Amino acid sequence: MTAVENVALPALYAGVKKNERVKRAIEALESVGLGERIHHKPSEMSGGQRQRVAIARAIINNPRILLADEPTGNLDSKSGEEVLEIFKKLNDNGTTIVMVTHEEDVAEHCKRIIRLKDGVIEKDEIVYNRRGV
């Protein structure tokens, strides 16, 4: 399955017609910097590119909230920064990003940090001077 086919799947499940699905999938891939990779398969992409395909798939139906569980966990630092920049742009355009991470440097990109310990909220802070997802 190519990147554009993969990204279009949620729109298929939502009942979107094929032409509109493909158009949205291409737009989503372009928005995450993969416009030139739409016909590539996962085996032809780096880990960071595959993660951006997953983000494009998650945003194709324009969700108000995006849940991200360890979105940078398996990425090198450059690819991780690219993913966080995509999240920042999505957030700037009105999408709420709920991100789970164990990495302090990733959490530093967030506007609000809720720390859990043993399943209990230990600290809830809004941080205004962050780079902001």
Where are these regions (language model features)?
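Conserved beta-strand-loop-alpha-helix hinge in the C-terminal portion
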Residues: 120-133
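ABC family nucleotide-binding domain
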Residues: 1-116
